[in-house]
Structures are given as C-alpha cells and as structure tokens.
Amino acid sequence: MRKARITARWRGAGAVVAAAALSLGVAAGCGSSDSSSGGSGSGGSVDVVGYSTPETVYTDSLQPAFNKTPQGKGVSFSDSFGASGDQSRAVEAGQPASLVHFSQAGDMSRLVDAGMVAPNWDKQKYKGIAEDSVAVLVVRKGNPDGIRSFDDLVNKDVSVITPNPFSSGSARWNIMAIYGSQLHEGKSPQQALDAVKTVLGKTQVQPGSGRDALAAFTQGEGDVLISYENEAIKAQSEGESVDYVIPPSTILIQTPIAVTKDAPKAAQDFLDYIWSDAGQKIWAENGYRPVNPKLVDLKKFPTPKDLFTIDEFGGWDKVNDEFFDETKGKVAAIEKELGVSTAG
C-alpha cells in the first residue's frame, strides 16, 4: 500500500524566508540516469519540488504508477509545486528536495551554483529534460477574435494573459516565443522587442505562475492566454470552454529535471521511471510531448511549421542575463515601465 503523501506549496518571498529558517542542510545533485533500477524497492521518501503545471501529473499519475513497480514499492512522496523561480529560490534557501523539476534551465543553474545539483545534470538521459511542450495561444471557444499567430497579439485589440516573468518560468518561454517568432519573420531584434512590449502592454494581470494564469483565464480574465500546450489540453479535458492555436512559428519548451546531491536511491529510481516508456506515456496522456521521439503521436502533437529552441538565442544563461536580469534585463526595463514588479 502506498504511504501517505504530504503536499506542501511554497510560494513567493515568504516561502524563501520560511525555507531559510529550516535547519535541514539539503544537498542536491544529479545521479546517473543510466544506473540500474533493478531489484525491490527500498522504501523511503522522495521530496519532489517542481514548477506549477505538472502537479497533478505527479500526484495523480506518475507517483501512483511508480508505487506499483518493484522499485517504487513502499516509497512515499512529499510534494511542493509553485512558480518555478520561487521554487528554485526556496530550495536554495533550504527547502528539502531530492528531485527538482523546473520550467527552465536557469532555475536549475541556480542550484548548480549553490552546489546542490551536479554540473552534469544536462548530460544525463534526454539531456536532463523531463518532457516537452510548445507555446500556444489559448482562446475562447470558437476563437471569436480569429487569433492565429503571435502577430495577432501585436496587431489586434485583445487583452492578453501571461504570467509574471520574474516569478514564472513559463512566462519567460512565452516572451521568447513572441520574440523568436518576430525574428523568424525577418524583423530586427529591436522590432522583436517592441512586439514583446506591445503584448505585455495588453496584459491586465500577470499571475505568479503558469497554472495561476490558466485559472485566471478560465475564470474569465482576458481574450487570449499564452501558455504551454499541455495547459490548453488540460483545460479542454476538464470541460473548459476554450480552444487553442499552435502558432506557425513558436518555441519548443523543454523543462529540466534532476535528482539532488546525496538524494536517496528512491529519487533516482523515480527519475528513471519518469524517463521510461511507461513514464513518458503518462506525460503524453496528460498533454505533454514525450522526450522519446518514438512515443510522440503526431496526430495529437503536430509539429509546428517553424519550431525553434532557446539555444537559438544562446541558451537560458545568456537569455536570462540579457532579457530577465532584474536590474539590467531588456524585459525588466519593459515591465518597470509598465509598472509591473520585477522582484524575484
């Protein structure tokens, strides 16, 4: 029988302060994803800290399925899900974590720099990526505004919902999707940045996380939500009156995952399960694109006409410094001009 699971949510600055008060010195790092997971489960507990959107995939699907395997027998989970940047900062401050899953690599780099995650986390299986998605445009049923691309967000009189990029990793993906799509149309970097500014200027609210942004949209805020494809699929599966559009030019979203230094064997076993065919099929069932290309159903997950990656802009370390640094980033300057908080 599966042990009781403790679910905790740590969000915002208060979460970091609370985490710092803990006397638990959590070491964090990345064990080899190719290590054997044979034999019977050793029990124990896995502390999962993740970004907001895959919470129910973990609690309702991945963890129960893992518990049914020989390696997962007797393993219990303590879970914390929230805005990716907030979660990463909380772990750095002392929140217990043996497996971390963030929405963008910059949040993992923070823990590498803190000595909590091994530097070679991205040299593991599937380059340390748990699952894929793409940035999409979620609209009201029937798409009354005729939204087809990121250009429409720039040119049409619509209200946009996207999270705050200084707490949410998904917001950073959204912004780079807009920026990259403009470059791919032949616009200059300044014109692409102007497009980002125009879209952000149409946001009446910037929630703290991708999941909070979806909630705001389904509760009636805004005309268009920029979101992960899996969030749109989730909303439809739950009966929400929405449609979604995959823009012809959009970004491939890749979310990093790693076990922490000195994490228990159960954490590595769970990560191995996440990367297994069984685990990847669970991601697919929940609207995420498997990282194993052999498991991608192209009818459910069509390939966008023009799909680009964050590497095109130099990777997340460069992007975070150029665009999202709180003091000198290009997007920080835009948000400050709009009166939006850039405090991490």
Annotate each language-model stretch with its function.
Residues 135-143, 252-267, 282-286, 291:
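A bilobed periplasmic-binding-protein/Venus flytrap-type ligand-binding module shared by bacterial periplasmic
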